[in-house]
């Protein structure tokens, strides 16, 4: 259960967030994902209030993240020991819990030695404040370096990798997924429905459906959902995908989630919801599996799209906290 909508002006308020969480847990979902940077900590606070007041804390695996900016100061972001320790204490307070089950580094910090990050995480694990560590939006080579560092320094390691992965952003499957399977790292994809693009609700006109993420989130400066998904290749792939769903009477949500889940090592695809009905729709779709002959058609569409319009993975890798040299600069 993804929770970046909680406390967002375009998302949901606390009452709705609690109703969403209750519906999700009642339906068998037991993984809740958040971040200290989601809506200035409001997401963590809403989750913490619900789990503490309902007495359901031990029914879920609770995951959160550090690294993104949570204030204006130079130490209010990053993967340094200084920031991680402070971030964990603040997350524990907002989440109203004594432990974080899975703590991610939200993205690679190129200006902090990865050993410093892992030693801080190792200490927090020994203190019982976190149970497992994970990485999010890391390039494969950085995850590999982290695993090697943990091995040679005898430190707790990254046990999970979370990144965007869906039919329209398939890059994770090229290298990271097989690498993670080989090294026993769980793969936790987010945005398996491509922010709703795979439902087919957005047409080639380029006009977003009113009230959708594409409509509500500002993309005037680029880099947002429209910049990512509103192009001819994507619309063509979505048309083919939704046609398969219609032909076989299968929900698009089921096919999109099943495509992601078929990859070895994928453990908990994350979807978000702003309304209770969104959760109910996913639970209903996920209650059954599509036949393999249907999924073979879906795989064909995904393979064709990747061959025609490959996308970089992960987005902006290496550009946060330091920029990788360009090809001309590297010569």
Where are these regions (language model features)?
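Generic structural signal for well-ordered alpha-helices
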Residues: 21, 44, 48, 88-92, ...
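Glycine/proline-rich, positively charged
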Residues: 4, 26, 71-175
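Glycine-rich beta-alpha junction loops
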Residues: 66-68, 139, 165-169, 191-202, ...
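Conserved, mostly hydrophobic/aromatic
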Residues: 17, 32, 47, 62, ...
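Short, well-ordered coil/turn segments that N-cap beta-strands
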Residues: 28-30, 56-60, 97-101, 127-132, ...
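Aromatic-lined glycan-binding groove of carbohydrate-active enzymes
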Residues: 172-215, 251
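Terminal-tail/helix-coil boundary detector
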Residues: 206-243, 247, 262-266, 276, ...
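N-terminal binding-site loop/beta-alpha segment at the start of enzyme catalytic domains
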Residues: 1-60
């Amino acid at each position: 259960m993804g929770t970046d909508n909680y406390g967002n002006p375009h998302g949901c308020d606390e009452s709705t967030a609690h109703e969403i969480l209750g519906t999700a847990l009642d339906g068998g979902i037991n993984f809740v994902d958040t971040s200290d940077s989601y809506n200035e900590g409001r997401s963590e606070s809403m989750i913490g209030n619900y789990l503490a007041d309902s007495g359901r804390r031990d029914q879920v695996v609770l995951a959160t993240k550090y690294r993104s900016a949570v204030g204006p100061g130079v130490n209010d972001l990053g993967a340094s020991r200084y920031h991680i320790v402070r971030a964990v204490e603040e997350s524990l307070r907002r989440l109203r819990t004594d432990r974080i089950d899975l703590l991610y580094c939200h993205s690679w910090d190129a200006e902090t030695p990865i050993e410093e990050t892992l030693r801080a995480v190792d200490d927090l694990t020994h203190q019982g404040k976190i149970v497992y560590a994970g990485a999010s939006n890391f390039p494969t080579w950085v995850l590999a370096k982290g695993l090697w560092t943990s091995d040679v320094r005898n430190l707790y390691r990254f046990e999970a990798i979370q990144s965007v992965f869906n039919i329209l952003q398939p890059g994770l499957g090229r290298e990271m997924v097989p690498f993670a399977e080989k090294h026993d790292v769980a793969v936790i994809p987010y945005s398996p429905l491509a922010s709703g693009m795979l439902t087919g609700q957005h047409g080639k006109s380029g006009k977003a459906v009113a009230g959708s993420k594409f409509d509500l989130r500002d993309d005037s400066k680029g880099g947002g959902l429209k910049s990512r998904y509103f192009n001819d290749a994507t619309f063509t792939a979505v048309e083919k995908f939704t046609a398969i769903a219609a032909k076989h009477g299968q929900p698009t949500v089921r096919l999109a989630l099943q495509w992601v889940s078929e990859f070895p090592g994928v453990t908990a695809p994350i979807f978000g919801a702003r309304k209770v009905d969104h959760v109910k729709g996913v639970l209903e779709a996920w209650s059954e599996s599509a036949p393999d002959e249907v999924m073979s058609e879906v795989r064909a569409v995904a393979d064709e799209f990747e061959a025609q319009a490959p996308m970089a993975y992960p987005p902006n890798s290496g550009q946060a906290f330091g920029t990788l040299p360009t090809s001309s600069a590297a010569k």
